[in-house]
Amino acid sequence: MAQLPQEFLTRMQDMLGDEFDAFLTSYDAPRTAGLRVNTKKCRTEDFPPLVPGMWKKIPWIPNGYFVPDGMRMGQSPLYAAGVFYLQEPSAMTPASRLPIEPGERVLDLCAAPGGKATELNARLKGTGLLVANDISNARAKALLRNLELFGSENVLVTNETPAGLADAVSYTHLTLPTNPRV
């Protein structure tokens, strides 16, 4: 298992209680890789025939697949074309579960590198507005690149502090905080 700081372990034990041992065991499990199909460029069910392999759907993500062991999807021309986004399956969950509808205005305060933002934008179906922010200029540039690669529309990329966007919160239907505890 990886060497983890004691302060982190104590905090996690307090938060997880009886599930703490399972959490520690998870560090010894093989890494699970996933990808999310860009439904603006490819229907989910049309993806597996494009790349031969043993594809298995991620049950809780409508447009997600587990990446088969040994596949190097980051080198695929389809990745370079924005047909899919490489993302840990658990990281796909927030954007797929948020209660947003086409036409709404969404503010993502911590949007880089673009996993959530590209999915939220796809769910808006070319309507409404996504304000995708990151406080880091370098990360905001990576965010912009991924949004462009995905063919995102009706999106505004900002490089601002959350306090600097405080007035925007009242304009949006949904705001994703920088800290899940907020």
Task: Describe each model-derived feature in a short phrase.
Residues M1-L176:
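S-adenosylmethionine
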